[in-house]
Design a protein with these regions (language model features):
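ASCE P-loop NTPase motor core, strongest for the SF2 helicase catalytic module
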Residues: 1-183, 189-426
Length: 426
C-alpha cells in the first residue's frame, strides 16, 4: 500500500524492509496493478547475480508479464527493436551502464534499483548512468540504504528526488559531524522519513525463529603473531618515512591493512609465499566448529571476503570427507548450486564469497552462518546472515563471527559498531 499510495502521488521512494521480507514480491504486485492501466515497460536494474532471480520471481508472481532478462550484448541488442512490447526489462548494473546510448531513447513507467547501494558513490559510473534514465516513477529497493556514511543516502535521494537534500557540497558541510551529533541524525531522519518504508522481521514475522549472534575469539599461534608484528612494524616504518599527502603513502597503508587481515585469516594468503608453513589459529578454530555443527546435524554457510581463503579450506574439507557446495563471483550456475544445497540433506556446508553470496540467495535449509573474517561494513555481514534468517526458516539461526584477539579485526569491529549506530539513528 505504501508503494501504491506514494507512486499515485508521484513521489519516488525507498522500500527498505529488512532482507527476506519480500521486497521483490511487493514491487511486482505494484507493477501488476499498474499493468491494468496500460503502463509502459518497467526497468529493473540489479546486481548481475540477481537477474535470474528477478526473472524467476516474475514468472511465478506475474506470469502474464512479457519479461526480458538479457545475459549478453547480443541478447540485449535483440530486445531494443521491440522494447515497447515488454512489460518488464531486467538488466544488471553493468548492462545498464553499457546500454546507456540505447536506454536514453526510451521512457519507462518505472525504473527500479535493487540493492541500490551500487549507486552510493555519487561519482561512480553506475550512479551517473542510473540517474540519467528516464522514467515516470523511480523506486529503490535496499535493506541497507546507509552503509558507510550519510553520503550513501544523499546519492540515493539524488536518484529519487534530485535536489531534495541539496547539493553534495552543502550536504557534506551541514552533516559533517553526524557521527557524533544526535541532533543532526534526527534532522536527517526527519527529512527522509516520508519517503522511506522500513519494516523489520520482528514487526512483520513475530513467529520467525530467533537469530543468535555470537563473536568467537581466538589467539594467534606464536609464529603467526611474530609474522603479524613484523608486517605491522614494517607498515609503521613506511608510514613514518612518507609524506602525509603522498599517494604512495595511502597505498602503503591499504596494503598493510590488507596484509594484516590476511595473516589473521591464514598466513598462507600472503603473496610470494611469505606466510607459507605458518599455522592459522582461526583455520583450526573453524575446522573444530564445523565438525561440532555437523555432528549435531546443522547445515552451515561459511562466508569469507577472500576467495583464496575458501580455496585453502577446500583440501581440509576433502581430506575430512565433508561434502560441500561452493559459490563466488565467477560461479555461473548459481541457482543450481543453491538448489543442490537446499534440497540435499547430505551436504552440510556451503562456501560463499561475502560479496557474491551475500545478496539475493535463499538458503533457509541452513541454520548456521559463520563469518570467517569481519568486513568494514556491518551491513554486508547482516545481508549474509539473512540468506538463512528469513521467511521460510523453521529453526533458530546462529550467526558466528570469528575474530583474532589483539589484531586489526578488533579495530574493524569498533568501526562496525560506529557505523551501525548511525544507521540505527537515521
Amino acid at each position: 500500500r505504501f508503494l501504491q499510495y506514494m507512486t499515485d502521488r508521484n513521489y519516488n521512494v525507498i522500500l527498505a524492509d529488512e532482507m527476506g521480507l519480500g521486497k521483490t514480491v511487493q514491487l511486482l504486485a505494484l507493477l501488476a496493478s499498474r499493468k491494468k492501466r496500460g503502463m509502459a515497460p518497467a526497468l529493473i536494474v540489479c546486481p548481475a547475480s540477481l537477474t535470474d532471480n528477478w526473472a524467476r520471481e516474475a514468472a511465478k508472481f506475474v506470469p502474464e508479464f512479457k519479461v526480458a532478462a538479457p545475459h549478453d550484448g547480443t541478447e540485449r541488442g535483440a530486445i531494443w527493436k521491440s522494447l515497447p512490447e515488454y512489460d518488464l526489462v531486467i538488466l544488471s548494473y553493468a548492462a545498464a551502464r553499457l546500454s546507456g546510448d540505447k536506454l536514453k531513447h526510451y521512457s519507462f513507467s518505472f525504473v527500479v534499483l535493487d540493492e541500490a547501494q551500487h549507486i552510493k558513490n555519487p561519482g561512480s559510473s553506475n550512479a551517473r548512468h542510473c540517474k540519467s534514465l528516464d522514467a515516470a516513477h523511480r523506486i529503490v529497493l535496499t535493506g541497507t540504504p546507509l552503509e558507510n556514511s550519510a553520503e550513501d543516502l544523499w546519492s540515493i535521494f539524488d536518484f529519487l528526488q534530485p535536489g531534495m537534500l541539496g547539493n553534495l557540497t552543502a550536504f557534506r558541510r551541514y552533516y559533517a559531524d553526524i557521527r557524533n551529533d544526535s541532533a543532526l541524525q534526527h534532522d536527517l531522519a526527519a527529512r527522509i522519513a516520508p519517503f522511506v518504508k522500513r519494516r523489520t522481521k520482528a514487526m512483520v514475522t513475530p513467529d520467525l525463529p530467533p537469530k543468535h549472534e555470537r563473536t568467537i575469539y581466538c589467539e594467534m599461534e606464536p609464529e603467526q603473531r611474530r609474522l603479524y608484528d613484523a608486517v605491522l612494524e614494517e607498515g609503521r616504518r613506511a608510514l613514518r618515512s612518507s609524506r602525509q599527502d603522498d599517494a604512495r603513502s595511502n597505498a602503503a597503508i591499504f596494503t598493510t591493512l590488507l596484509r594484516l587481515r590476511q595473516i589473521c585469516c591464514h598466513p598462507a594468503l600472503l603473496p610470494d609465499g611469505e606466510g607459507k608453513g605458518v599455522p592459522s589459529a582461526k583455520m583450526e578454530l573453524l575446522l573444530e566448529l564445523l565438525h561440532e555443527h555437523f555432528d549435531s546435524n546443522h547445515k552451515v554457510l561459511l562466508f569469507s571476503q577472500f576467495t583464496s581463503l575458501l580455496s585453502l579450506a577446500i583440501p581440509e574439507l576433502e581430506e575430512s570427507g565433508i561434502p560441500f557446495e561452493y559459490l563466488d563471483g565467477g560461479t555461473r550456475n548459481r541457482q543450481q548450486r543453491v538448489d543442490h544445497f537446499n534440497n540435499d540433506p547430505s551436504i552440510p556446508l556451503f562456501l560463499l564469497s561475502l560479496k557474491a553470496g551475500g545478496t539475493g540467495l535463499n538458503l533457509t535449509s541452513a541454520d548456521t552462518v559463520i563469518i570467517y573474517d569481519p568486513w568494514w561494513n556491518p551491513a554486508v555481514e547482516l545481508q549474509a546472515a539473512d540468506r538463512t534468517h528469513r521467511i521460510g526458516q523453521t529453526r533458530p539461526v546462529s550467526s558466528l563471527k570469528l575474530v583474532v584477539k589483539d589484531s586489526i579485526e578488533e579495530k574493524i569491529l569498533e568501526l562496525q559498531s560506529r557505523k551501525q549506530e548511525i544507521f540505527d539513528s537515521v
